[in-house]
């Protein structure tokens, strides 16, 4: 596994963080273990008052790909926009700090986007329970007939009706920048993922969906 930082990585993975010490190590473990190694992992610490910043620094010492934006609390939208400003990758991915991803998640998503020359690639995902016993359940937003081929997402309303799940996708950074797609910076604003996902679908010329959960 490569732990070296690249000046122009394939993908920038944004992780917004606020008081998630309980879950953060599992999240970061899944990020640094990605089979797509040419990534930068941008941790945006939104004024955490627990041990989250110390955990981030611990991973920064072990892996040069891990970086931190350490700032006063300003909310999810501003945090994500700060991450987008720092991103240098050809693609942008998002990982919520209380979540984790399959080891090959980013590799699958980027490969699909590349093969279809898509503005974004998006996959199904699993619901996960750790108690009373570990189990997973596929949330099938996209049926096999809709997957693995380029589509124009705004041609049908079905894709606007799916869960936003902005973290089960990768986006071409130049596509986001050309279309001015950002998050609402207003502190406390709700449904940030919904507005971001809507703008992505409305602006994209081409997308590809994956049936596999990531």
Task: Explain the meaning of each model-derived region.
Residues 1-214:
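Nucleotide-sugar donor-binding/catalytic module of glycosyltransferases
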